[in-house]
Amino acid sequence: MTSIVTYEGSLRTTCVHTAGEQITTDAPLDNHGMGAYFSPTDLVATALASCFLTIIGIYCEEREIPFTFARVEVEKIMASNPRRISDIHLSIDFRGNDWDEKTLTKIIAAGKACPVAITLKDQVNIEYHFK
């Protein structure tokens, strides 16, 4: 088991990981919700950025490459009929890392091969923008 998700009413769920950490989701404002918490589709888009950075962290750790900073701004674009995520744009800031171009290229490739990206690649247009 990975988690337990409980419907709390008012289009809100509570999600509890086996380690005990908890998050709450809410339907977005444009789909009958209050927009007070991440929506389920927000979590999908955010999971992509988190997975991208986690895999880069693993890649760098295994190769003893210093990885001191990264920040990703996530933009999720929805489509309708049926309602779904059509696009995810990641704006990635790696400033402060002392990587040459060859290393950066390999690091980016590792991140783009993360499990969430592989899962989404045939269903969602993913764009990566680097600052």
Give short role names for the model-derived ranges.
Residues M1-T46, G57-K131:
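Extended beta-strand/beta-hairpin segments
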Residues C51-F52:
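Alpha-helical metal-binding/catalytic segments enriched in His/Glu/Asp
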